[in-house]
């Protein structure tokens, strides 16, 4: 059997080699690989030839033939996040079931790296992009509008773009409204940059409005900013407790920052105090296991990954009855309030 030698010196099996060994035409091998009709006898011979030779179909050749690489670019803000891991699990479930693979890019919460990866993916062989979005700047909007492959956003509602998101304002309003009736004393708030429309701006505004609906004001002097991390929540809470030792409760924009605030309260007021004095967002499983559950908001992160990926692939695959790229708002659930 004839084998070609690649530039790396490794023997490369070609389709014609499989055909020669199986005693069939190259066209028959191609039909077998693409699920076309072929007799049982020929199919078995081709299967055995592939197993004997270790033949692997070239993804580049498939892309040239079909116009599809079966690759989806996925851009996430960080990989050490429970919410992101749930989202990517949902994405992976759908991609695997429908014959696609994932190329994962981690931005470390850097908005400029989101733009770099958007440019990289659309100029390299991916069929579409899923962006787990954080900050949406004018540059982001231009990049999304001009993207040459279909793109779906998760986590932000951007006008004119395909999005799967949760209503952060509504969820935060409900949380603030519920907490106002059970917290005696001053309430502080640790948020994130409001350049992040969903987690920063909408959650703070919604929480403040929820308190205000029952006559409780959020003192601007008791608002601090963190950076999504446990350490930033801890540092902000320690600073709040030093300048306002009579603070009764600290609401946080994420469960991770709430874990840091909980630790700070335990250090200042005694072990076990923190779990009764903080709230978060995200329903973190690890924090729930440690505390029994703090007041928080549960989002269907896995569902958002599933829905966004199905939306994208239905468009790419031309699934009948699907309306293509659109905006989808998912529900939420208050926990432990």
Report the location of each language-model feature:
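Flexible loop/hinge segments that line or gate small-molecule binding clefts
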Residues: 132-177, 182, 194-195, 256, ...
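N-terminal helix-turn-helix DNA-binding module of bacterial transcription factors
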Residues: 1-70
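Hinge/beta->alpha junction and helix N-cap segments in small-molecule ligand-binding domains
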Residues: 76-86, 104-113, 164-174, 190-238, ...
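Short acidic capping loops at alpha-helix termini that bridge into adjacent secondary structure
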Residues: 185-186, 218-222, 269-277
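Flexible loop/turn connectors
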Residues: 243-249, 254-337
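Periplasmic-binding protein-like
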Residues: 126-132, 188-191, 223, 244-254, ...
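Short beta-strand segments enriched in small/hydrophobic residues
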Residues: 26-30, 64-80, 185-193
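Amphipathic helical "hinge" segments at domain boundaries
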Residues: 56-128
């Amino acid at each position: 059997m004839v084998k070609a030698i690649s530039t790396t010196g490794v023997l490369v099996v070609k389709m014609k080699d499989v055909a020669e060994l199986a005693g069939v035409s190259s066209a028959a091998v191609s039909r077998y690989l693409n699920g076309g009709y072929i007799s049982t006898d020929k199919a078995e011979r081709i299967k055995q030839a592939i197993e004997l030779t270790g033949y692997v179909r070239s993804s580049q050749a498939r892309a040239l033939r079909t116009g599809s690489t079966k690759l989806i670019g996925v851009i996430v803000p960080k990989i050490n996040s429970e919410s992101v891991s749930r989202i990517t699990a949902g994405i992976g479930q759908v991609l695997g079931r429908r014959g696609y693979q994932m190329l994962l890019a981690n931005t470390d919460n850097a908005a400029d790296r989101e733009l770099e990866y958007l440019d990289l993916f659309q100029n390299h062989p991916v069929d579409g992009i899923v962006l787990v979005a954080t900050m949406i700047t004018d540059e982001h909007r231009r990049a999304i509008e001009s993207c040459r492959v279909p793109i779906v956003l998760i986590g932000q509602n951007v006008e004119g773009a395909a999005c799967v998101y949760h209503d952060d304002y509504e969820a935060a309003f409900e949380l603030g409204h519920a907490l106002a009736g059970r917290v005696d004393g001053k309430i502080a708030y640790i948020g994130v940059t409001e350049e992040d429309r969903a987690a920063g701006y909408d959650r703070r505004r919604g929480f403040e409005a929820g308190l205000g609906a029952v006559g409780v004001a959020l003192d601007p002097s008791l608002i601090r900013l963190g950076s999504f991390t446990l350490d930033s929540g801890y540092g902000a809470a320690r600073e709040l407790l030093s300048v306002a030792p009579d603070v009764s409760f600290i609401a946080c924009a994420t469960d991770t920052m709430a874990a840091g605030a909980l630790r700070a309260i335990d250090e200042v007021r005694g072990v076990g105090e923190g779990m009764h004095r903080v709230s978060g967002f995200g329903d973190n499983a690890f924090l729930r296991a440690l505390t029994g559950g703090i007041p928080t908001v549960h989002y269907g992160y896995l569902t958002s990954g599933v829905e966004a990926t199905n939306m994208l692939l239905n468009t790419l695959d031309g699934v009948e009855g699907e309306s293509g790229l659109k905006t989808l708002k998912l529900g939420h659930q208050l926990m432990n309030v």
